[in-house]
UniProtKB/Swiss-Prot annotation:
Belongs to the FYV10 family. Residues 164-221 form the CTLH domain. GO terms for biological process: negative regulation of gluconeogenesis; proteasome-mediated ubiquitin-dependent protein catabolic process. This is Protein FYV10. Residues 126-158 form the LisH domain. A zinc finger (RING-Gid-type) spans 326-387. GO terms for molecular function: ubiquitin protein ligase activity; zinc ion binding.
Length: 402
């Protein structure tokens, strides 16, 4: 008995599998913001408290005159005013993250209030998620302004990580241009997290700086750079450090491997891709766009072996009776669905009069005869609705399902 749509109960847990980064990203951003506050306060405290104590003692002992004491106090006041400005900026960032988290939690809670798939609220919620997935795909593809416009038009700016992907794209593009400054600054801000996961991004960036110094022929500077930035990684990156040392003996136009590859400008693309992977790992972002993951799940539910057969239904002849409305067979989705698994069917629907054609395709005889008649095939002949081949009825053999 068919189950009506109104009786299909919604399972929020299944729907939220795609939405895990929704709360993880603001949580990670809040943690980073707190660490920044902690680091700045500790640095200023380590400077101001000893300086204040020293100034007070000097003033009491008379080793400093009043003018020098006032100058020292003014310097400390200026420093504290700078601290206040930094704290205000970080506080605004914290408020922004808190607002984002609140909106995202509300968005998730709304799903738990929807009783079934037939509820009109589910359609509204799904439309919002689709817009989110589209914006996510645009951001990952580099269409930042389009994603921003979509988010603003649909009122989902707090549900989309615009600033996160904007920063990621900016740094990735700087690496493709041959610049390491922004990427190294990012590594410095995330030094503890990178060390925890034993990521080699910073080492690769320093190695690239070493290569660029050698490219201009400054071997003395290259040795100093290696001693300062590469040697500290000797325990974990000894093999690459040895290869880097070998570069001293080879010019940039060498054809010898692995040095030719190390000098190659393609390394900048490798660094850009490595940065994006590292950035996404730290923020618990998936390596693939969420839209692609969602599509893959849906495509798998629809995919059958005939969708990627040698004879594609979408390319069949005009006389073919095959349909071209299958999403898997469409030009847009066919390649994306190529590597997803087939649908898992626990029950099969088999015609009660199956026959096999000479090309080994199986159909129901009544349905095959009816379609052949509609296609104008001469009497005593049948036509394969997929390939368009025509066979004599005597060539058709009955199939017995055991």
């Amino acid at each position: 008995m068919a189950v009506e749509l109104t009786s299909i109960k919604l399972n929020p847990e299944n729907h939220l599998l795609l939405d895990q980064p929704l709360l993880r990203v603001p949580h990670e951003l809040a943690r980073r913001n707190f660490k920044s506050v902690q680091r700045i306060v500790e640095r200023e405290k380590d400077y101001v408290l000893p300086a204040l104590k020293e100034t007070a003692n000097a003033s009491l002992s008379g080793s400093k005159n009043p003018t020098e004491t006032i100058e020292a106090l003014d310097a400390m006041i200026t420093r504290m005013q700078g601290l206040k400005r930094k704290m205000e900026v970080l506080h605004e960032e914290e408020k922004k993250i808190a607002t984002q988290s609140q909106k995202r939690i509300q968005y998730i809670q709304d799903l738990y209030k929807i009783p079934s798939l037939a509820d009109v609220k589910y359609e509204q919620w799904s439309r919002t998620r689709l817009n989110r997935l589209l914006a996510d795909h645009m951001l990952r593809s580099g269409y930042l302004e389009s994603a921003k416009q979509l988010a603003e038009d649909k009122g989902i700016a707090d549900l989309v990580d615009l600033s996160v992907f904007a920063q990621c794209q900016r740094i990735a593009h700087s690496l493709r241009r041959g610049e390491t400054k922004e990427a190294l600054q990012w590594c410095g801000e995330n030094k503890v997290a990178l060390k925890k996961i034993q990521n080699r991004l910073e080492f690769e960036l320093r190695l690239q700086q070493y290569i660029e110094v050698l490219r201009v022929g400054d071997k003395a500077e290259a040795r100093q750079h290696a001693k300062k930035f590469l040697t500290p990684h000797s325990e974990t990156q000894s093999h690459d450090i040895q290869r880097a040392a070998g570069l001293l003996a080879y010019p940039p136009d060498t054809r010898a491997e692995p040095y030719m590859s190390m000098y190659s400008l393609e390394r900048w693309k490798h660094l850009s891709d490595l940065f994006i992977r590292t950035h996404h790992d730290l923020l618990s972002l998936s390596s693939r766009p969420l839209l692609q993951i969602a599509l893959s799940a849906g495509l798998s539910a629809l995919k059958t072996p005939s969708c990627h057969s040698a004879i594609a239904s979408s390319r069949a002849s005009p006389l073919s009776l095959s349909t071209s409305i299958c999403p898997i067979c469409s030009t847009e989705l066919n390649e994306l669905a190529r590597h997803v698994p087939y649908a898992h069917h626990t029950k099969s629907s088999v015609e009660n009069d199956p026959v096999v054609l000479p090309n080994r395709r199986v159909y129901g005889m009544d349905r095959l005869s009816d379609m052949s008649k509609k296609a104008g095939v001469p009497e005593g002949k049948v036509k394969d609705p997929i390939t368009g081949e025509i066979f004599d009825v005597s060539e058709v053999k009955k199939v017995y399902i055991s």
